[in-house]
Curated annotation (Swiss-Prot):
Gene assigned in the entry: hfq
Alphabetized UniProt keyword annotations: RNA-binding, Stress response
Record has Ribonucleoprotein as a keyword: no
Family label: Belongs to the Hfq family.
Renumbered residue ranges of the record's region Disordered: 64-99
Protein name: RNA-binding protein Hfq
NCBIfam families: Hfq (TIGR02383), PRK00395.1 (NF001602)
Sm domain mapped to chain residues: 9-68
Amino acid sequence: MAKGQSLQDPFLNALRRERVPVSIYLVNGIKLQGQIESFDQFVILLKNTVSQMVYKHAISTVVPSRPVSHHSNNPGGGSNYHGNNTAASQQSQEADDAE
């Protein structure tokens, strides 16, 4: 499995599994919204009032409506969607709150 897939797949799977609403921005600037129904190596099925097959090569950014947790193969277990360790992320949030 390619390194890119090892981050991409757990992230997309968490969004799919938790039915998190997402905004997907395409490289041409179009914004699509919905829930990830399914995905593979090349496409994402995005469901709103209809299902749309969106080719990954046309996607610029995937923005969840809320943070999601996903597990990777990295030592330390869980990470949030920014790719940070959950404990480090919590400490960072506490430091921000203290300011």
